[in-house]
């Protein structure tokens, strides 16, 4: 069990670029460690052109024995330009390509990563964006499997889950008004039946999970509108909006006085002891850090999140 009451704030600060975003936390049973994967933005890049500092990013990896004390481990290694995106042949005005927003699932003794690939290093928000599937045994070195054929070539922020033998991927389709979109697969590689999940404005970072005997969808409502939560009976369709969390800027913890972005969820415990932990990032200018809070069920049946509930106890790992 992750003891959130002992979590530092910030939880993690990338020691190389101070631009950790898009956290995804998963337990590796073979390594007996928690792995945190994140986009390693180049937040301290000197004199960047436009938003080039958000491009050219690698996938950072931190590990933890307890889910609260994190140590920077490495950046993800692998073929298909995963190791060194800046050395790749890109289509943008600056050298290289970009990796963003990894999502993970553990299946058949392998970690499966679905990560956004941008085909260049751009100074604006252009370029082709696809979801790429990699696998890994150790969680550090990955092998390319396939590039998903989805609803457009402007898709980002994939997460994958399984219901009754079918895999579902939710993602942001920027070519469809940045709506949350869902595709399905029987083999984790051939994706079909793309359809819109929610019509509620621009969204990114969709993630589906089980909590309180129900299916939940959490999204980052852009721009700076907090984390919207939806509920479904079957986890596939019929999503109903319930509430929004981490919308305010009244966090009292260090570097937590801003809207929460791009959630990663860990649900632990059972029954009355079940907890929904949310890993998210906050901005301080270009620089970002990862924070940890708890989503709880309010008395009215709507999720709430008091980020100030637990006081920080130690300095963040990675500093």
Model regions: which residues?
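Carbohydrate-active catalytic/glycan-binding domains of CAZyme proteins
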Residues: 1-319
């Amino acid at each position: 069990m992750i003891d959130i009451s002992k979590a530092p704030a910030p939880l993690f600060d990338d020691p190389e670029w101070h631009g950790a975003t898009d956290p995804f936390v998963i337990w590796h049973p073979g390594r007996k460690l928690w792995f945190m994967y994140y986009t390693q933005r180049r937040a301290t890049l000197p004199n960047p052109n436009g938003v080039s500092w958000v491009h050219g990013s690698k996938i950072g990896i931190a590990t933890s024995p307890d889910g609260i004390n994190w140590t920077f481990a490495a950046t993800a290694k692998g073929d298909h330009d995963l190791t060194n995106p800046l050395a790749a042949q890109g289509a943008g005005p600056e050298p290289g390509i970009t990796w963003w927003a990894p999502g993970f699932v553990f299946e058949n003794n392998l970690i499966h990563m679905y990560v956004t690939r941008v085909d260049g290093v751009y100074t604006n928000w252009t370029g082709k964006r696809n979801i790429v599937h990699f696998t890994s045994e150790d969680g550090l070195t990955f092998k390319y499997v396939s590039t998903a054929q989805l609803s457009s070539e402007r898709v980002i922020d994939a997460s994958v889950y399984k219901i009754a033998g079918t895999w579902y991927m939710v993602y942001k389709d920027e070519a469809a008004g940045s709506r949350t979109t869902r595709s399905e697969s029987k083999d984790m590689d051939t994706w079909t039946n793309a359809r819109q999940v929610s019509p509620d404005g621009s969204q990114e970072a969709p993630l589906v999970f089980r909590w309180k005997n129900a299916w939940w969808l959490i999204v980052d409502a852009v721009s700076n509108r907090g984390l919207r939560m939806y509920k479904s009976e079957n986890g596939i369709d019929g999503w109903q909006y319930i509430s929004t969390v981490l919308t305010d800027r009244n966090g009292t913890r260090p570097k937590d006085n801003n809207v929460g972005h791009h959630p990663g969820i860990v649900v632990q415990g059972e029954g009355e002891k079940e907890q929904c932990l949310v890993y998210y990032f906050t901005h301080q200018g270009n620089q970002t850090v990862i924070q940890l809070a708890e989503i709880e069920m309010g008395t009215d049946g709507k999720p709430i999140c008091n980020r100030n509930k637990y006081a920080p106890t130690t300095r963040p790992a990675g500093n």
